[in-house]
Amino acid sequence: MYQEDYLRNYIKESELRVFNDRIKVRLSSELAIKYDLGVYTNFLTRIENEMKMLDKLKIKSPANAKPILYIYVVPDDNFTFLLQMPTLFFKDKKSGGKPVTCYDLDGFPLAYGLSQNCLENKETDNLEIADLENELHELSHIVLSQFLLGNQVISEGIAETLPLYCLRLEEKFEKYKQVIATLEENNIYSLKELLNKQRDGSYGNDAVLPNMTCSFRLSYISSYLFVRGLLERVEEKYLLSTTEAINYLFSILRGNRGYANEFFIYDIADALELPHDELLNKKDIQRKALNSIRRLEM
C-alpha cells in the first residue's frame, strides 16, 4: 500500500543553501530568510567542526567518494510528523532531530533532519559533553550509512563507539563512566536479546538515568560494548590501529548490507573467526569491553 512521503514533498519545495563545500542546507522559504540573516551560522559551524573530528578517524568512503552532508531544517510545529520522530522518546518534546533519508544524489544516504529551534536555540559555546557526544552520535549514523542501513543493533553500537571509544570522549564523560562502573554482566543484553528488542520495538526503552541522551539506555550501552569489543578484537588480532580497525570492520559491514537478523551476526563472526554462538548468545565480547573501560579508571 502506497504511503505518501511528506518529507520528500517538503524537500521538493524547499530552498537550497550551500554553507560550504561539504555542507548544504534545505529548508522552507520562510526559514531560508533566517538562514540568509545568519541565524543558523553558529550552529552550522559547530556541525562542520564535529565532522572534522570524525575526519580524524580516516574513514574511507566507498569508491573514494566525497558525499555532502545535507541538513534538512523543518518547522517546529510539525517536526515530529515530517521527521517521523519516535513517539517513545519525543512525545512531549518541542524540538529534535535525527538522520533521515537523503533525497539529494550528491549526499550521504542519510541527511540530518532537524527542527528549526535546534539551530536557533542550542548553545554553541561551551557545549556539554553529553550534547557533543549526542551530536557526534547522529553524525556517525550519517557517515555509517555509506556502509550499513537497517540493522539498528549494530548501527547504534557504531554510532556510540566512534565518539566514545575512537575519539576518546568517554575519558572526559564523567557521568557516563559512573554509570558504566555500576553495571554488571546481567545488566547487559546479549546480541540475541538486542535483536529481539529491535524486532518488538522495545530497543532503547530502558533508560538508566531519566532525561538523558540515548547513551544512558541499556540497549545502546550493550550495543556499544559489543561494537567496541569487536574493534578491540580486530586491533589485537591483526595488530591494527583503531582507525585501521574501523575501516576493516566497515569493509565487513559493506559486504553485508541489508541484513537485520542473526545471519548478519554470523557473517561478522566468520570474518573475525569467532564461534556463532559466542557472538550471538553469550556476552564475552561485551564483558571484555566493559573490563577494558574499568581498567582505564584504575
Model features per residue range: what roles?
Residues 1-21, 291-298:
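N-terminal low-structure segments adjacent to metalloprotease catalytic domains
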Residues 3, 193-298:
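Pan-zinc metallopeptidase signature
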Residues 12-46:
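Fold-level signature of zinc-dependent metallopeptidase catalytic domains
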Residues 36, 40-47, 124, 128-136, ...:
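Solvent-exposed, acidic/flexible segments
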Residues 36-121, 125-129:
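Auxiliary, metal-adjacent structural segments of Zn-dependent hydrolase domains
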Residues 52-59, 141-145, 163-171, 231-236, ...:
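Sec-exported extracytoplasmic/periplasmic mature domains
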Residues 54-72, 145, 150-155, 174-177, ...:
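Surface-exposed patches in mature extracellular/periplasmic domains of secreted proteins
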Residues 103-181:
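Zinc-dependent metallopeptidase catalytic helix centered on the HExxH motif
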